[in-house]
Amino acid sequence: MNEKYKHFPACHVVFPPKCEERRAAFYLAAEEYVAETFNEGNYIFTWQLSPTCVFGRNQIPHSELDINFCNQNGIDLCRRKSGGGTIFADRNNIMISLITPACDVESLFAEYAEMVSSGLRKLGAPTMVSGRNDIILEDGRKVCGNAFYHQANRNIVHGTMLYGTDVEKMIGALTPDKAKLESKGVVSVKSRIGELKEYLPFDVTTLRSRLITMLTDKSLELSEEDIKSIEELEQTYY
């Protein structure tokens, strides 16, 4: 293993095919389940969603989202247990979940972000790490953001990677504080969004597969009993 990367390659958590199209709450519950059940080693899995807005544990949905727009456009809503801002995801995004033993959060974020960014550069996208938890293109547009929380003596990092997205739906759903955007020199949500499809000569399914190849070297297949336990945990999300 490369000494630079203490948590990679990780073990790929494989879901049964019937779990490919679930709501966000299912996959967030799966993170918890893996953290609580497999208490040694590093695990990673990817997932995709129908149009969904996921907001942080301390956020007020009506302050972050146009709820009427979401309802009218079939956009699901889910609160995660980590902090951070509200994100919009659809089938052209890749969600990444990393579960590791408890460790220094700053170093984990740095390692994870650099590992992913380095992999994207090898695939042809001119990315770099920005701040603690973002990956951006060389022109400053954001293509990946990440959040973290602690569960059962484990660290859980989850990220959203923008291969492409329905920008108009995203803009309609999200209502960020304009003053906060301006303080960061951002004119609008749209101006800050980058899409990896501009640089990669393959589709989102291929990108997802290549990420797993880059980040893992073994796999763990979840059983039907595992899925039932995850579905029970899913009920704790709203």
Q: Where are the model-predicted features located?
A:
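Active-site loop/lid in soluble adenylation, ligation, and acyl-transfer enzymes
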Residues: M1-E64, F148, R192-Y238
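Short, glycine/charge-rich beta-strand/loop segments that flank catalytic centers
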Residues: Q48-C53, S130-D139
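Short, conserved charged micro-motifs
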Residues: S63-L65, C103-F109, K169, V204-T206
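Short, hydrophobic/aliphatic alpha-helical segments
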Residues: L65-C78, N146
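Contiguous, small/hydrophobic- and glycine-enriched helical/loop subdomains that border
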Residues: R91-N133
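Long, positively charged amphipathic alpha-helical accessory segments at protein N-termini or as interdomain linkers
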Residues: E114-V116, L123-A125, C144, Q151-Y238
